[in-house]
């Protein structure tokens, strides 16, 4: 292929004066000869072709010189083609100018605008930047630029040209959503001073930030050239604007124009028509009706409409309408009949009220503003079309040509109209745009012009006046026939004329219908509109006329208003006043000039007055005692508060008590104890309760009233308090804990905000007796608090930063209590609970104890801190301040305070911009910027005034959505009262921007539209905060919370799907109905009343990706009670008050009306205070009653509320001296225990080696001589025992280096025939050798720290002597206790002091003769040394020392046989043991497999010891308590015995035990050693898996029947027959692989993981089994993926590794774990 002569050449063509034909030829010649051409000069250009050298700017000349671009004229192209070679450009200089040389300054104005400062040189120029390039009007080869764009920014500038003419330029920043190559275009269009010639320039940018910066700099450059900014567009400048900009300029033209007389008369007429209609109907002026009341009234209309359809009685309908007339007071009497026609009229009335209030927003202080103000308030361009013009005649002809009536129509006037948002949002791309007619009463025209045509709220056949409307559902109706539209255009009351609208309607694909369809709310699928075909002679339909219906407002664009009349209309003269001049309105502003003037109040503010806090003598009347009992389950709590106070006055008083709570609380009980009487409060509707209270006080009876005055204030009116009487008030409430990361916080406030107190204190309920007010719980009164805590996961820590606590706890349960002498000061009470596995979702289901009802609670706290980027580094914060007229007054001052405080919290990494908005908007910067100082931004906020007209927030949102951020996210903080114009468009823009923009709303003002702001935040993936003027003390925290969320990743669009198997069940009652967005460390609680539901699915979007998680529970795990019922009821009530029941405000209000009766019902059933209900109780008093009544025994009443569910444990943190002085029970009180004979039974134990934590020496350890031991008795508390015996205990220890519990014993350690040398290495073998030698008798156990993912063992219960008074318990180890056993009296010389589990002795006494060190058989002496560990946990192990050296009758007797080589003589103290093992047991898991994680009683037995090889180790007997749970009793109700053989080949091999009738204990081979490998591998199928058969269970020591039963209960049947069998095979194969893996790891063969056991590198080590393992591993990997997350779903464990280890007994398991039943299932 021959290359053209212009190959590798790129020509920039600037041939302004070349004829059009030659331009085309030039372009064609370049292409045909291998060249390329461009109209813009860029670094790739090799040549520039000019027909006049003067067209080059200085910047272009510099660029040409720098890039070595050749300059030539067009002849260079043509002569090079003629000679077929590339000629030298030196001979082809550009053409010189003609004879007339323009002045120097004219060259700049007639050529391209200089932009030297804008475009960087080629070294720094980005690839996406194209310099501004000039185009002449005659230039046709303009590069392709997207035409489907929107204008984000625009400006017009003017300057005087050289010849005295005006030069104008319009600069636009255009945004294209579809074009990736040209997303942002800066376009400028110049009109030269001759008024004829124009030129264009453009620049393309890739990001909104670059485009905004370029736009700003370009305007500045134009100013340097003498251009001045114009505020309004002139007609000439308007012609320069793009078509899209001209649509936006409708409002500009409207605001800058003066009114013609015709337009002024029209505005006055429609305004008078609307106001006159309202004045005729309403009892009070329209501007005194709240828009919130209008929304409620519209909701009532929808409710009445539904009731009408359901056939409610006329009486019931009238009752419902009464509420409507209360909200919207009417003149005259109410109509007796309620029908759809009445509802339609009232709906139109509500819309008219709403429209007029919105229109009047700009002139709130003027009841009758001038015509120009009314016109501008309409926000709609209206122009009069002169008669006899072509446009007038054309429109008149179009209207009349489809008039099928015989009555003539007289078209009086035509007005051209245009609305900005209709022009910008009109869906013309749907096609099939037709001009159609819409008729409406004159009084509705103001609203239509202001907000456009809306979808009707009540859509039904409205009777004779409107024949067809509603026949095609809820849409906007049009007709192409004037005769049809006239039916709806009624003559006005003002001048008797009618009005008609002509609209462009984008019908798109229209579906013809012949039958009515009332259910339509949108066009049928695949269509954009519907057409009701009119009936003709040949076609039978349901429609009299042609009806066109659309269901989207953006398919409509108004064009004309037709003013007309018909024969019979009475035309009246209407002469509006000539008051047309607009007076500038200047509201009064605060004169604050400093940021300090806008400071928010501190969170804690002291009261400025003591009013109401004193008695007649001025003395405070504080409470005497405050006692709190509480119960915390998961993250919810129930709290009971007891308050005691006395009337020290000699006269009866009315006392009122302010009870402070946070907004999460719900009071659910109120009781009073006075004069020996118990008064229980009842929930009644508020008016009824208050009336009952007043009557009781008047009659001299005692009365108690409690109501909710604010979210965090409850008021108790105690009523008549007799002189010297003591009253105990008992209040019960439920609440939710605050969550800070993985820490749950319970807080009990001591006082409330002073302004809330003062308001409640000053309210007067009765005037009979003196009123004394008690303002706070008290500062120095007696205070006590006891709470139980129960978690589904391990409690990491518990502490209070306000009080010193004592506590007792297990892994998942705890009881805490304040120390004696505590008081409650202004800090309140705070409790912090460290939670593990807090991010696991969970489900709680509670059955009601008295009725058929189930309440569900979902707990969901997403861990958003994982794998999410730091949002703050690339985020923008846009503070949008509402400056509309409705914000005037104190509301605007508060808005400024909030905006300024938010500004002060913006991070250094965040970009910031401030926008003031009203009808228009003003921004601080042209694009968000990093700011080093807040001064400029703060001054911008402080300078704002509420004079910007209406609340057109949609314009600001549209602008921001067009200039979306290129990186990171944008966060809008909206500060507004929520009375927005065009709410639907605003909502659409918020949803459209959600991928890159989040919206956080701050509601201000007592009349704020909270629903609108809440729904904007919900759809904008943000959160709404309402700033209540009554609770300013919380404003700082509210703002800080919002600003924290701005920098946090979020989880939005959260939804819950409840599993309801019965399709006929009613719709689930869920709260919140619309789940708000969640942010870092947020916790979601979703409640519901859903019957028979055990599973729910949570769906959410995180970074616009959908995530799902399934949570479930089982029938067995359902609890019984009322706490979750009360919480669910409170959540529904809260959602009723502050939630989103429906996106549409009217439907939301209708649902509120529907739910009101349910809310009252829930309130009464669950004893919950709401805005409709109160507690009231009346105490009837006798006249002869003693003036000094009996004081109630407060301590007894409080003691009845016992929350301590760990009574068997001792308090931690209690002073040691206090423990020593406690009364002790004598050991003789313990019951007599005997051992029943056991039948022959084999008991398998765990295979894991018994190991102990290697203790570390703590620096806190102090060695101290024991000295003389005082006599003591049984039932010692922990502190005293530890102090006396120098032993310590901790419940949970960190694992360290381990050693086997039973070690090889050297000969020197067994040289004597004493029990102790054998016992020492057996039990205390972790001790150093020196310790073993000197103190072989010391007993200590260590424990492992428990690790649990969800739940852990319930703490063991311990019992005092009174619980064993019923005689001997069968199955104990009494018969195995030796007659006498020596007791070790001290620890080793160097006892370890790191957390470990020691044995603690209790229940014994030593006589005074026992003060000397105890001598043991064999000559060993224990050294009397001790160590104390006050920081360690409470004891779990208890050894009892009998008080009597005689045989222990209470525990039976032991009679050694004659063959026994050793006989123990009675010694100073006999030893028995009452040992309880927690989950992290003192004994390793291997020792307690039968009672894994379960409390058992351990009796330490000793046998005679001969030689090492023939010796028998100590025997441990396990005994269950008679109060253990039923599911454990099967295994634990009888004793089982363990004997460990000390084998020299293996450190610790556990055995099967046979307990025979002759009490003989036989040691059997280790269960793993006994495994027949051949038999195990023979059970493998050809495909590589194992079946879960009893044969396999025997090999694995697993009860397969129990496992089958367990899986069936957990729902494995739902997988189907095939799925169930496959899953059982998978479980069996996993178990075998884990079994093989564990066995081989003992031989030193280590596998990477359970799923990768077929590693070829280890094949040589197990050639006999490798193929089987490989085949099984491959099958497992193929199959496991079919069952994702099946382990947690079936509650087997977190994953396969942990599940199989627990099933095989290789890993400890909690007693509360569902698998515990499997492991303890009877092997029968």
Curated annotation (Swiss-Prot):
Keywords: Cytoplasm, Cytoskeleton, Glycosyltransferase, Methylation, NAD, Nucleotidyltransferase, Nucleus, Phosphoprotein, Ribonucleoprotein, Transferase. Residues 369-573 form the PARP catalytic domain. Residues 242-370 form the PARP alpha-helical domain. Pfam families: BRCT, PARP, VIT, VWA. Residues 1-94 form the BRCT domain. GO terms for cellular component: cytoplasm; cytosol; extracellular exosome; membrane; nucleoplasm; nucleus; ribonucleoprotein complex; spindle microtubule. The modification Phosphothreonine is found at residues 101, 333. The keyword Acetylation does not apply. The modification Asymmetric dimethylarginine is found at residue 1476. One of its GO terms (biological process) is DNA repair. Belongs to the ARTD/PARP family. Component of the vault ribonucleoprotein particle, at least composed of MVP, PARP4 and one or more vault RNAs (vRNAs). Interacts with TEP1. This is Protein mono-ADP-ribosyltransferase PARP4. It comes from Homo sapiens (Human). The gene is PARP4.
């Amino acid at each position: 292929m021959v290359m053209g002569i212009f190959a590798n050449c790129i020509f920039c063509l600037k041939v302004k004066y070349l004829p059009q034909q030659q331009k085309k030829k030039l372009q064609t010649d370049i292409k045909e000869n291998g060249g390329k051409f461009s109209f813009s000069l860029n670094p790739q250009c090799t040549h520039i072709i000019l027909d006049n050298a003067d067209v080059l700017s200085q910047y272009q000349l510099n660029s040409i010189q720098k890039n070595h671009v050749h300059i030539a004229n067009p002849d260079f192209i043509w002569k090079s083609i003629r000679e077929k070679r590339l000629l030298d450009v030196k001979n082809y200089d550009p053409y010189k100018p003609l004879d007339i040389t323009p002045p120097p300054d004219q060259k700049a104005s007639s050529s391209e605008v200089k932009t030297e400062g804008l475009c960087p040189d080629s070294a720094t120029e980005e690839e996406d930047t194209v310099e501004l390039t000039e185009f002449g009007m005659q230039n046709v080869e303009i590069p392709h630029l997207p035409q489907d764009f929107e204008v984000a920014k625009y400006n017009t500038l003017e300057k005087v040209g050289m010849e005295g003419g005006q030069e104008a330029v319009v600069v636009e920043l255009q945004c294209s959503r579809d074009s990736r190559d040209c997303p942002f275009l800066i376009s400028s269009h110049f009109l030269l001073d001759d008024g004829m010639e124009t030129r264009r320039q453009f620049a393309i940018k890739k990001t909104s930030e670059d485009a905004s910066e370029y736009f700003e700099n370009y305007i500045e450059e134009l100013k340097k050239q003498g251009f001045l900014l114009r505020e309004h567009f002139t007609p000439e400048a308007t012609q320069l604007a793009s078509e899209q900009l001209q649509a936006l300029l409708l409002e500009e033209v409207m605001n800058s124009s003066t009114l013609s007389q015709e337009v002024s008369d029209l505005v006055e007429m429609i305004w008078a028509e609307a106001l006159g209609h309202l004045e005729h109907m309403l009892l009070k002026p329209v501007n005194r009706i709240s828009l919130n009341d209008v929304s409620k009234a519209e909701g009532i209309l929808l409710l009445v409409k539904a009731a009408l359809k359901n056939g409610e009685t006329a009486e019931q309908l009238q009752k419902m309408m009464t509420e409507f007339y209360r909200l919207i007071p009417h003149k005259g009497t109410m109509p007796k009949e309620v029908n759809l026609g009445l509802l339609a009229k009232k709906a139109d009335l509500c819309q008219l009220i709403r429209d007029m209030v919105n229109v009047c927003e700009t002139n709130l202080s003027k009841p009758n503003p001038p015509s120009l103000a009314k016109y501008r308030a309409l926000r709609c361009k209206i122009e009069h079309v002169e008669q006899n013009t072509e446009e007038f005649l054309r429109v008149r002809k179009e209207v009349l040509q489809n008039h099928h009536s015989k009555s003539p129509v007289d078209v009086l006037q035509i007005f051209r109209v245009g609305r900005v948002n209709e022009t910008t949002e009109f869906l013309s791309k749907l096609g099939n745009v037709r001009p159609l007619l819409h008729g409406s009463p004159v009084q509705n025209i103001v609203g239509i012009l202001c907000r456009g045509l809306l979808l009707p709220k009540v859509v039904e056949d409205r009777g004779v006046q409107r024949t067809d409307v509603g026949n095609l559902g809820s849409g906007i109706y049009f007709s192409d026939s004037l005769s049809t539209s006239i039916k709806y255009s009624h003559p006005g009351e003002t001048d008797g004329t009618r009005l008609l609208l002509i609209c462009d309607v984008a019908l798109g694909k229209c579906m013809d219908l012949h039958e009515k369809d009332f259910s339509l709310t949108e066009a049928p699928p695949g269509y954009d509109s519907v057409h009701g075909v009119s009936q003709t002679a040949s076609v039978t339909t349901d429609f009299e006329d042609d009806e066109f219906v659309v269901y989207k407002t953006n398919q409509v664009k108004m064009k004309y208003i037709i003013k007309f009349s018909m024969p019979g209309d009475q035309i009246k003269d209407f002469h509006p006043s000539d008051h047309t001049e607009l007076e500038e309105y200047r509201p009064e502003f605060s004169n604050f000039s400093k940021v300090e003037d806008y400071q928010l109040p501190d969170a804690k503010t002291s009261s400025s007055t003591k009013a109401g806090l004193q008695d007649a003598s001025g003395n405070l009347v504080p409470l005497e005692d405050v006692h709190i009992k509480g119960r915390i389950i998961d993250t919810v709590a129930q709290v009971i508060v007891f308050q005691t106070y006395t009337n020290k006055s000699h006269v009866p008083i009315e006392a009122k008590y302010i009870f402070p709570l946070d907004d999460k609380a719900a009071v659910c009980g109120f009781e009073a104890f006075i004069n020996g009487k118990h008064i229980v409060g009842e929930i009644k509707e508020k008016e009824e309760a208050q009336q009952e209270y007043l009557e009781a006080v008047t009659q001299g009876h005692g009365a108690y009233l409690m109501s909710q005055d604010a979210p965090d204030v409850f008021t108790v009116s105690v009523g008549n308090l007799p002189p010297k009487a003591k009253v105990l008030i008992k209040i019960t409430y439920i609440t939710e804990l605050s969550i800070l990361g993985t820490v749950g916080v319970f807080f009990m406030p001591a006082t409330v905000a002073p302004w809330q107190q003062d308001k409640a204190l000053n309210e007067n309920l009765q005037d009979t007796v003196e009123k004394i007010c008690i303002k706070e719980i008290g500062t120095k009164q007696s205070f006590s608090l006891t709470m139980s805590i129960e978690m589904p996961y391990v409690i990491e820590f518990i502490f209070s930063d306000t009080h010193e606590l004592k506590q007792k706890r297990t892994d998942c349960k705890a009881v805490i209590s304040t120390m004696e002498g505590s008081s409650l000061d202004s800090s309140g009470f705070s409790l912090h609970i460290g939670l593990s596995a807090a991010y696991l979702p969970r489900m709680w289901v509670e059955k009601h104890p008295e009725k058929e009802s189930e309440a569900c609670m979902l707990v969901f706290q997403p861990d958003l801190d994982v794998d999410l980027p730091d949002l703050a580094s690339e985020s923008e914060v846009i503070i949008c301040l509402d400056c509309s007229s409705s914000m005037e007054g104190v509301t605007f001052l508060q808005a400024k305070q909030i905006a300024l405080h938010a500004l002060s919290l913006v991070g250094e990494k965040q970009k910031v911009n401030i926008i003031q908005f009203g009808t228009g908007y003003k921004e601080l910067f042209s694009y968000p910027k990093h700011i080093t100082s807040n001064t400029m931004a703060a001054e911008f906020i402080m300078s704002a005034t509420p004079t910007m007209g209406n609340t057109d927030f949609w314009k600001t949102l549209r602008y921001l959505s067009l200039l979306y951020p290129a990186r990171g996210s944008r966060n809008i903080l909206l500060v507004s009262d929520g009375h927005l114009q065009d709410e639907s468009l605003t909502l659409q823009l918020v949803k459209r921007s959600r991928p890159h923009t989040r919206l956080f709303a701050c509601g201000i003002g007592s009349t704020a539209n909270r629903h609108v702001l809440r729904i904007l935040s919900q759809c904008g993936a943000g959160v709404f905060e309402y700033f209540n003027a009554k609770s300013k003390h919380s404003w700082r925290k509210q703002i800080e919370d919002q600003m924290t969320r701005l920098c946090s990743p979020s989880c939005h669009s959260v939804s819950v799907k409840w599993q309801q198997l019965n399709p006929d069940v009613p719709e689930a009652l869920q709260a919140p109905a619309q789940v708000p967005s969640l942010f870092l460390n947020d916790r979601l609680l979703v409640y519901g009343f859903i019957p028979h539901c055990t599973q729910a699915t949570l769906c959410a979007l995180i970074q616009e990706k959908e995530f799902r998680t399934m949570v479930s529970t089982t029938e067995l795990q359902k609890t019984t009670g009322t706490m979750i019922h009360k919480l669910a009821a409170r959540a529904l009530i809260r959602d009723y008050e502050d939630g989103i029941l429906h996106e549409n405000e009217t439907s939301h209000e209708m649902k509120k009306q529907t739910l009101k009766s349910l809310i009252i019902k829930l309130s009464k059933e669950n004893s919950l205070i709401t805005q409709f209900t109160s507690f009231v109780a009346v105490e009837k008093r006798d006249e002869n009653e003693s003036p000094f009544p009996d004081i109630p025994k407060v301590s007894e009443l409080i003691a009845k509320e016992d929350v301590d569910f760990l009574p068997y444990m001792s308090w931690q943190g209690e002073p040691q001296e206090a423990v020593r002085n406690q009364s002790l029970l004598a050991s003789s009180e313990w019951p007599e225990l005997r051992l029943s004979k056991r039948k022959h039974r084999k008991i398998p134990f765990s295979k894991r080696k018994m190991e102990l934590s290697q203790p570390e020496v703590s620096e806190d350890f102090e060695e101290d001589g024991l000295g003389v031991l005082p006599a003591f008795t049984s039932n010692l508390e922990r502190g005293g025992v530890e102090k006396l015996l120098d032993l310590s205990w901790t419940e949970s220890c960190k694992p360290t280096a381990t050693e086997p519990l039973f070690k090889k014993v050297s000969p020197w350690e067994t040289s004597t025939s004493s029990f102790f040398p054998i016992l020492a290495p057996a039990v205390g073998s972790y001790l150093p050798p020196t310790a073993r030698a000197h103190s072989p008798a010391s007993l200590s156990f260590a424990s492992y720290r428990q690790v649990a993912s969800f739940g852990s063992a319930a703490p063991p219960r311990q019992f005092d002597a009174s619980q064993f008074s019923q005689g001997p318990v069968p199955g104990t180890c009494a018969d195995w206790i030796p007659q006498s056993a020596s007791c070790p009296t001290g620890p080793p010389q160097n006892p370890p002091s790191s957390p470990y589990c020691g044995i603690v002795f209790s229940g014994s006494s030593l006589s005074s003769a026992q003060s000397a060190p105890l001598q043991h058989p064999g000559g060993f002496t224990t050294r009397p040394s001790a160590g104390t560990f006050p920081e360690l946990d409470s004891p779990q192990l208890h050894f009892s020392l009998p008080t009597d050296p005689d045989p222990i009758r209470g525990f039976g007797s032991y009679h050694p046989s004659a063959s026994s080589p050793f006989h123990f003589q009675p010694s100073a103290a006999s030893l028995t043991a009452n040992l309880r093992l927690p989950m992290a047991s003192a004994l390793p898991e291997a020792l307690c497999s039968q009672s894994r994680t379960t409390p058992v009683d351990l009796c330490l037995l000793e046998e005679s010891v001969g030689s090492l090889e023939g010796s028998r180790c100590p025997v441990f007997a396990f005994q269950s308590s008679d109060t253990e749970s039923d599911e454990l009793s099967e295994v634990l109700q009888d004793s089982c015995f363990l004997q460990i053989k000390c084998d020299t080949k293996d450190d610790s091999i556990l055995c099967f035990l046979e307990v025979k009738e002759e009490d003989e204990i036989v040691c059997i081979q280790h269960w793993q050693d006994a495994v027949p490998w051949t038999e195990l591998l023979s059970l493998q199928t050809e495909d590589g898996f194992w079946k879960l058969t009893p044969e396999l269970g025997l090999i694995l020591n697993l009860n397969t029947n129990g496992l089958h039963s367990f899986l069936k209960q957990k729902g494995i049947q739902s997988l189907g027959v095939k799925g169930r069998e496959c899953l059982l095979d998978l479980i069996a194969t996993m178990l075998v692989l884990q079994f093989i893996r564990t066995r081989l790891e003992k031989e030193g063969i280590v596998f990477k993981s359970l799923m990768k056991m077929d590693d070829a590198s280890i094949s040589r080590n197990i050639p006999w089994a490798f193929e089987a393992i490989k085949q099984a591993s491959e099958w497992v990997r193929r199959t496991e993926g079919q069952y994702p997350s099946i382990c947690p779903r079936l509650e087997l464990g977190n994953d396969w590794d942990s599940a199989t280890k627990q099933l095989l007994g290789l890993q400890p398991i909690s007693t509360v774990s569902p698998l515990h039943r499997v492991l303890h299932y009877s092997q029968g």
